[in-house]
Structures are given as structure tokens and as C-alpha cells.
Curated annotation (Swiss-Prot):
Keyword Manganese found: no
DNA-binding region: 727-746
Name of the featured protein: ATP-dependent DNA helicase PIF1
PTM remark: Phosphorylated. Undergoes RAD53-dependent phosphorylation in response to loss of mtDNA.
Leading EC class: isomerase
Matching InterPro entries: DNA_helicase_pif1-like_DEAD, P-loop_NTPase, Pif1-like_2B_dom, PIF1_helicase, PIF1_RRM3_pfh1
Organism of this sequence: Saccharomyces cerevisiae (strain ATCC 204508 / S288c)
Residue range of the transit peptide in the UniProt record, numbered on this chain: 1-45
Spans through the membrane: none
Length: 859
């Protein structure tokens, strides 16, 4: 079956006109019962066998349609999410028909735009031009809020009013004709796409070991195995993981932990989905103690969420700082749940400060102001960084807030990461507890052999920043091409130079940054929702902002006429004016002015370098269009020439790195990285120290601290300068297997575990026992509700002496003994019969306190 038809099946067909062969049109119409119209046209067509079809009414295929199509030998059912509710169907249809009140064109609604592949070189308006055949794109899972979907997913819409379809006798004939004709018209050939010029290799440090690199010969479509169809890989939680999910659904504050590879991060992602379904997407704060860990779960650092900066100062000072920020104040007021990953690196003092802030802002004396808490991490891994070497480390579980608020502490026991390598699991568990025997030491020393040289570059982990910098600089020197040096601009009101230099070291942005084309880099600042501290990417080119402005406009609309580029190339002032209009949109003047001054100051900090031509790989997005039209080919060539001219006009200007970043979901994003500013402020928000620099650092090698929470298929670890408890365990447990692990300078005397952590872990319970306790508590609660007092309600006394139950309201009005019975319900009573009084009923207690007790009935 033609790929175009396959990609259309069991999805909404676009309302705009589309081009297909006549046979494909008949096949689609017969199978889908879609109300289609068509017109014969020769413009842009090679023969009259091709028609322009248009959907009169949006249509969705049912399961019966899919069953019919699956009879074909060539049919491959796409493994992708289906719409399930009529409400969603109506919403999508509404979005398709929605028109902009100004230009009367369909609005670029988020759900509608999901029909268009984000990496497509065509614009929205060009997707359905008569001269272009562009198949409708699949709907990705992220197109819809999963919280609004049913838990039991079907394979498609079921319409009970429409009978199952009968197979047409000409089905095979139509199918074969469609294959031959559709292939001749495919605009994008998946097998012949231009390779992305993205350097040789990149070790992507993500939580998903199946996608571990970006290669020069691998485009985005190859990241999914089914020819462009995004495959939904189902997450199957273990029984203990499901038990923890149920505890969270019941509103409990939870801390769960486990050894490396027990699926803590996977469970956390599923729990976040559940919590967002309960509280709403905007009311669940997803955070982590480090930027890289936050990147893995799609969140931000706890410091960034809370609005406390570095968290220095007493709790009241930080509270006042949060109060001054409307954004952070609103966050604290509205959230229903707070998720913190890698809680082990958060110290007790900071956790108590956050608890104080939450209670004060929310005016609620419950722990964290009544916010549901979900903590995850492993205290056997890296401890909090001690600010004062003379003060002992205090873990988060030692804080007052933890003891008051976190009642469910659970240990995960099933290992997934090193599953199948029982020996490796045992070695890691011994290292975790600091209990290394002779055999374990021998096994780790065997791993000093070099790793096989294949396509995947091993990530290198070191214990100190100096070692990381040395390794990264060595890798950079091996790359060909010119080195671009970016010097930071430091400032601030602090006069003590020694203290100032020490504070500047807290910034992740380096004082001097060396980059080349092909360098692997990491973002060190949160810029937006998808580009955060910890995002990894590769430098593919250097260009000035003016050139990038033209380049971005061309990538957004490859069909842009060359005349527009000619105007900008011949008249740079018009280009600058267009840039200023673009940058000022949506920004307050003060903010825009500050950003402009930062960039200008950084640009003046270096002399312009000689301009080298843009690499041809930058224009690969235009070469993906397969066409024999000489006019189109000439336009593409002309646009490349104009871009080179605009680039050459940038002589004397600072050129910035153009980086292709890789997200945790394997999508890519091209960004011209511009300078950012960092500052440490006093109580009046006056900068004590500040730095302006590109928010990048080289990332072939990482410190062990930054690697916590990562899964690395190939990793090289040097333990020569390990200095912290848990540091060696974190580094070695990043590996998936011994085959992908190289260990240098292993020393068993450096493998230690903290005694406080060992004692704390002895108090943890299993997920199964915690859930059983929850069920028992619910039964007790239900029993209490069943026996709760009320009008005309007969309750059994809880007193073991069979004391009377609370008396009904009618009796209370006639008998003054009711108040006394309620005050002393747990004491023994003996009441004598009284004449001329209303009848009073009392039930016999089912919990006798002694054998000599008697049942008493009030009458």
C-alpha cells in the first residue's frame, strides 16, 4: 500500500485540497467513506491521472476500516495513538475550521499544527498547494492532553451506526496501480534525504539508552524505526511501581528510592502524568535538585521554581524575596503537588526554608502549606554539597519538614537497568553499601580494559572540574577548523576581588569558552520550556544575528521568493529594521533595552574574525525537495548565493554558534545561542557579581555530579580523585552493562557509604507493605464512618466496658445525660432505669474490655 495512503489511514484527513492519483483517490474514498470531491487539473501535474481532491467533511476511519485494509499483504498498521472520544474529535474538527478574524485563514492552532511535521521544509500555506504532493502527517501522542483521555485506549473510532465494510473486488488492482503512481510523485524520498551535517558522533546523555547518539548520517526520521511513524513505546510498570502510583493518587506525601536502575525516573514520569490529571497541568511543579536531572524529567530546578536564587540567607529573607516576584508568588499559591527528583542532593536546611516559605505564602500550617509532596532519589548517591567544610552534612530526611510531612518512605527492589547481568547488580549493591570484598574488587579491576571502538563515543566521567576541562579541551583540539574564543564580561559592585572571584566560580558559564564546528556542548541556563539547563547539542556553524535572521526566515518558509533576500542583501539597513521589529514584538521596552545592551557589550568584547563561507550542509533543508523543475532548482541556487552574500557582509561583526540541540524525546531544535547574563544580588537586588557569556559549556566529558540520574550505554570512569561518599557508586552505576563500562584507577578504600544513610534505609518499607497499610487504614476509616454518630443512627461503643453510644438528638433534648455520655465515652458507666422518660437505645459494644463486663441498655 502506498505510504501516502498508509500515513492517512485512521487519522483525520485535512480539509484543504490535496493531490493524489485517481486510483488512490478511489481507494481512499471506498475504504474510508470519506465525503471527497475532486477536480481534474493539469497545472503542476505530469498527466491527467492525477486529481486535486478536497474533503468536504472531516472524516476518521473506524476499526472496521483498518481491519479491511489490513487484509492487504503490503499493509503495515502504524503504531500510533488514536483519537478516542467524540469530544476530542469535535475539538480537532473545530480547530481545523477555525478562522483567523483578520485574514480569514485557518488559525495556526497548536492541535492543527500537529498535522504538519515540525521538520518539514514546507510552510503551512505550501503544504497543500496544487503543485505539491504532501501527505498528511501523523498525529503524535503529544498532540493531546493525556489527562483527558480514557484509560483504556481503543485502536480507533468505533461508529456503531456504520456497518462493517465489504471488500471491493478491485481492491488489489487499485492498490498496485496506486503504488506505482504514488511513488513517482513523492516529494520527499525518505531513503534519499540529505544527511544532516552534524559532526561525526555525539554521546547523548539521556534517560533513554536506545537513542544514544546523533550521527552525521542520521536524520530525524531514522530515530524512529517505522519510516517516519512515531512509535509509542508502552510503559509497563511493575507491581511495586503501580502500588506507589496508587499511593500518590490517594494524596499521600511519598518518598521512594532504590538502587541505580530500579526505574525511579520512569516511575516518576508516569506519576507526573497522573498528578497532572488530578491537579491540572499548570498546578504540578516538576523540579529537581540539579539542572541536568530536571532536564531528564521535563522540569526545572527547585531553586528556579521557588524563586530563591542560590538559596542563601535565612528563611524570612528568602520569603520576602519570593513575595517581590509576582510569578513565583503565584506559583506557590496555585500548585497542588510538588515533585522533586534527586532529593538526595538537597540539604535539610534548604528543605526547611522551602517549607517555611510555602506555609507563609499559602497561610496554611500543614507541611509545605498542604502541597502534596513527591520526593525521589537515592541517598546512597551524592550527598548535598557542603557550604561549610566545618559543618557536617545534613541530609533532607533529617529536616523538620521531612519528619512532619513525609510519612510514606518506600524502597524499590526490582532492577531494570542492568537486568540480566546479575553479577553486575551484586557488584553495584556491594559498592552502594561500601562493602567491597576481594572478588568484587577483582571484577572491577578487570574492567580497566579499553572499550571497543565502534559508532558510539563513550561518555567520560571525572570527579573534579579540572579533569573534565582537560578532557574536553583535548577532544576539541582534535577537531578540524578554526577555534572561536568567547571571553566573558564580569562585573558587579563587590570590591573584594578574592571574594568576587570565588563567587564567579559558582556560575556554570566559563570565563573563557573555546568552540569549533562539531563541538559537543551543553546548555547551562534555562531559556524556555524545551531549552533548559542540561540540554545537549552540537555546533554546526557560526554566523552573526543578521545572517541568522535571514536563515531562520528561509527555514520557516523555504518557498520565500529570492527577491526578499535580494532586498536584504543589497540594503542592510532594511534588514536591521526588520530585525528590530521582530525583536521588539512582545517585549517590554526596558527588557528589550537590557537584552540589547548585553548583546552589544558582548559583541564589542572581541575583534571581528575573517569571514569564511557558510558550509553547504547549512542549506540541506532546501535540497530535500526532489524536483526536476529548472525554475525551482534555480531559485534554490540563487537563495544559497544570497545567503552567502549576506554572511560575507557581516565582516567585523561577532559571529555566534548555531547549535542543533537534542531534546529527551529525540526531537531537534536549531538555535543561534546568544549571550546571557548571570548575577548574584544583594537584598536590594543590586548585582554584587555578574557575568555575561554564552550559556554553553563543552560536554564530551562530565563531572560525576552532573552525571547523576543519567543512563549511559558506554561510559569511561576515572576514579583517581574520588573524594566524596557515594561518588564512585554514582559514576559506575550509570552504565547499562559491564560490556559498556571502563573503570580506571579503582581503589576499594575510596568506596564508602554514609552511616546516617544506612540507618535511615533500615526504616524504609517495601511498596507492597506500604500499599497494604494504606488499604488497612482505609478499612479502619470506612469502619469509623460506618459507626459515626448521627440522627437516628445506632452506633456501637468503642469502649471496652460497653459504655453507651452517643444518644440521638431527640433523646438529647429530653435527657441531660447525653452530654456527660459524650464527654466520658471511653469510661465505664452504669445507668439505672428511669421511669417516665423517653426510650433511649444503646447498642452492645463488640469490644468488651473484660470478662466481667455487662451490657447496659438505656430505656
Amino acid at each position: 500500500m502506498p505510504k501516502w495512503i498508509r500515513s492517512t489511514l485512521n487519522h483525520i484527513i485535512p480539509r484543504r485540497p490535496f493531490i493524489c492519483s485517481f486510483n488512490s483517490f478511489l481507494l481512499l474514498k471506498n475504504v474510508s467513506h470519506a465525503k471527497l470531491s475532486f477536480s481534474m487539473s493539469s497545472r503542476g501535474f505530469r498527466s491527467n491521472n492525477f486529481i486535486q481532491a478536497q474533503l468536504k467533511h472531516p472524516s476518521i476511519l473506524s476499526k472496521e476500516d483498518l481491519d479491511l485494509l489490513s487484509d492487504s499483504d503490503d499493509w503495515e498498521e502504524p503504531d500510533c495513538i488514536q483519537l478516542e472520544t467524540e469530544k476530542q474529535e469535535k475539538k480537532i474538527i473545530t480547530d481545523i475550521h477555525k478562522e483567523d478574524p483578520v485574514d480569514k485563514k485557518p488559525m495556526r492552532d497548536k492541535n492543527v499544527m500537529n498535522f504538519i511535521n515540525k521538520d518539514s521544509p514546507l510552510s503551512w500555506n505550501d503544504m497543500f498547494k496544487p503543485s505539491i504532493i504532501q501527505p498528511p502527517q501523523l498525529i503524535s501522542e503529544n498532540s493531546f492532553d493525556q489527562s483527558s483521555q480514557k484509560k483504556s485506549r481503543s485502536t480507533g473510532f468505533k461508529n456503531p451506526l456504520r456497518p462493517a465494510l465489504k471488500k471491493e473486488s478491485s481492491f488489489d488492482e487499485l492498490q498496485n496501480n496506486s503504488i506505482s503512481q504514488e511513488r513517482s510523485l513523492e516529494m520527499i524520498n525518505e531513503n534519499e534525504k540529505k544527511k544532516m551535517q552534524f559532526g561525526e558522533k555525539i554521546a547523548v546523555l539521556t534517560q533513554r539508552p536506545s537513542f544514544t547518539e546523533l550521527q552525521n548520517d542520521q536524520d530525524d526520521s531514522n530515530l524512529n524505526p517505522h519510516n517516519g511513524v512515531k512509535v509509542k513505546i508502552p510503559i509497563c510498570l511493575s507491581k511495586e511501581q503501580e502500588s506507589i502510583i496508587k499511593l500518590a493518587e490517594n494524596g499521600h506525601n511519598i518518598f521512594y528510592t532504590g538502587s541505580a536502575g530500579t526505574g525511579k525516573s520512569i516511575l516518576l514520569r508516569e506519576m507526573i502524568k497522573v498528578l497532572k490529571g488530578i491537579y491540572g497541568r499548570e498546578n504540578v511543579a516538576v523540579t529537581a535538585s540539579t539542572g541536568l536531572a530536571a532536564c531528564n524529567i521535563g522540569g526545572i530546578t527547585i531553586h528556579s521554581f521557588a524563586g530563591i536564587g542560590l538559596g542563601k540567607g535565612d528563611a524570612d529573607k528568602l520569603y520576602k524575596k519570593v513575595r517581590r516576584s509576582r510569578k513565583h508568588l503565584r506559583r506557590w499559591e496555585n500548585i497542588g503537588a510538588l515533585v522533586v527528583d534527586e532529593i538526595s542532593m538537597l540539604d535539610a536546611e534548604l528543605l526547611d526554608k522551602l517549607d517555611f516559605i510555602a506555609r507563609k505564602i499559602r497561610k496554611n500550617h500543614q507541611p509545605f502549606g498542604g502541597i502534596q509532596l513527591i520526593f525521589c532519589g537515592d541517598f546512597f548517591q551524592l550527598p548535598p554539597v557542603s557550604k561549610d567544610p566545618n559543618r557536617p552534612t545534613k541530609f533532607a530526611f533529617e529536616s523538620k519538614a521531612w519528619k512532619e510531612g513525609v510519612k510514606m518512605t518506600i524502597m524499590l527492589q526490582k532492577v531494570f537497568r542492568q537486568r540480566g547481568d546479575v553479577k553486575f547488580i551484586d557488584m553495584l549493591n556491594r559498592m552502594r553499601l561500601g562493602n567491597i570484598d576481594d572478588e568484587t574488587e577483582r571484577e572491577f579491576k578487570k574492567l580497566s580494559r579499553p572499550l571497543p571502538d565502534d559508532e558510539i563515543i563513550p561518555a567520560e566521567l571525572y570527579s573534579t572540574r579540572m579533569e573534565v576541562e582537560r578532557a574536553n579541551n583535548s577532544r576539541l583540539s582534535k577537531l578540524p577548523g578554526q577555534v572561536h574564543i568567547f571571553n566573558a564580561i564580569d562585573g558587579g559592585a563587590l570590591e573584594d576581588e578574592e571574594l568576587k572571584e570565588r563567587l564567579l566560580q559558582n556560575f556554570l558559564a566559563p570565563k573563557e569558552l573555546h568552540l569549533k564546528v562539531g563541538a559537543q556542548v551543553m546548555m547551562v541556563k534555562n531559556l524556555d520550556a524545551t531549552l533548559v539547563n542540561g540540554s545537549l547539542g552540537k555546533v554546526i556553524e557560526f554566523m552573526d544575528p543578521e545572517t541568522y535572521f535571514c536563515y531562520e526566515a528561509l527555514t520557516n518558509d523555504p518557498s520565500m521568493p529570492p527577491e526578499k533576500l535580494e532586498t536584504w542583501a543589497e540594503n542592510p539597513s532594511k534588514l536591521k529594521a526588520a530585525m528590530e521589529r521582530e525583536q521588539s514584538d512582545g517585549e517590554e521596552s526596558a527588557v528589550a533595552s537590557r537584552k540589547s545592551s548585553v548583546k552589544e557589550g558582548f559583541a564589542k568584547s572581541d575583534i571581528g574574525e575573517p569571514v569564511s563561507p557558510l558550509d553547504s550542509s547549512v542549506f540541506d533543508f532546501m535540497k530535500r525537495v526532489k524536483t526536476d523543475d529548472e525554475v525551482v532548482l534555480e531559485n534554490i541556487k540563487r537563495k544559497e548565493q544570497l545567503m552567502q552574500t549576506i554572511h560575507q557582509n557581516s565582516a567585523g561583526k561577532r559571529r555566534l554558534p548555531l547549535v542543533r540541540f537534542k531534546a529527551s524525546d529525540m526531537s531537534t531544535r536549531m538555535v543561534l545561542v546568544e549571550p546571557e547574563d548571570w548575577a548574584i544580588e544583594d537584598e536590594n537586588e543590586k548585582p554584587l557579581v555578574s557575568r555575561v557569556q554564552l550559556p554553553l559549556m563543552l560536554a564530551w566529558s562530565l563531572s560525576i555530579h552532573k552525571s547523576q540520574g543519567q543512563t549511559l550505554p558506554k561510559v569511561k570512569v576515572d576514579l583517581r580523585r574520588v573524594f566524596e561518599k557515594g561518588q564512585a557508586y554514582v559514576a559506575l552505576s550509570r552504565a547499562v552493562s559491564r560490556e559498556g563500562l571502563q573503570v580506571l584507577n579503582f581503589d576499594r578504600t575510596r568506596i564508602k557509604a554514609h552511616q546516617k544513610v544506612i540507618d535511615f534505609y533500615l526504616t524504609l518499607s517495601s511498596a507492597e507493605s506500604a500499599y497494604k497499610q494504606l488499604e488497612a487504614d482505609e478499612q479502619v476509616k470506612k469502619r469509623k464512618l460506618d459507626y459515626a454518630p448521627g440522627p437516628k443512627y445506632k452506633a456501637k461503643s468503642k469502649s471496652k466496658s460497653n459504655s453507651p453510644a452517643p444518644i440521638s438528638a431527640t433523646t438529647q433534648s429530653n435527657n441531660g445525660i447525653a452530654a456527660m455520655l459524650q464527654r466520658h465515652s471511653r469510661k465505664r458507666f452504669q445507668l439505672k432505669k428511669e421511669s417516665n422518660s423517653n426510650q433511649v437505645h444503646s447498642l452492645v459494644s463488640d469490644e468488651p474490655r473484660g470478662q466481667d463486663t455487662e451490657d447496659h441498655i438505656l430505656e
